[in-house]
Amino acid sequence: QFTFNEAISLEVRVSGQEQLDQVWAALVEGGEELPCGWLKDKYGLAWQITPTEYYDLLGKGDPEADSRLMSAVLKTIGKFNIAELQAAYKGS
């Protein structure tokens, strides 16, 4: 029997916390939350639900802010909180 693992995953880019929350809730039902904005659905397939705001911040070219953002990402268990990612990026 074939089982999924993290060697294959799908990314869904969402815009805003409301859309992130909706997509997350639909996919995680019967599955499990994982670190760094990842989840496994009820079939064991890994998903990363990523807000477009994350990529907007990374594209600004500030290495120190990028480092703070990545630190916040690595500390996240379950879904992202966009306001927390933005605060980490700003250093607040």
Language-model regions: role of each:
Residues 1-92:
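Glyoxalase I/VOC metalloenzyme domain signal
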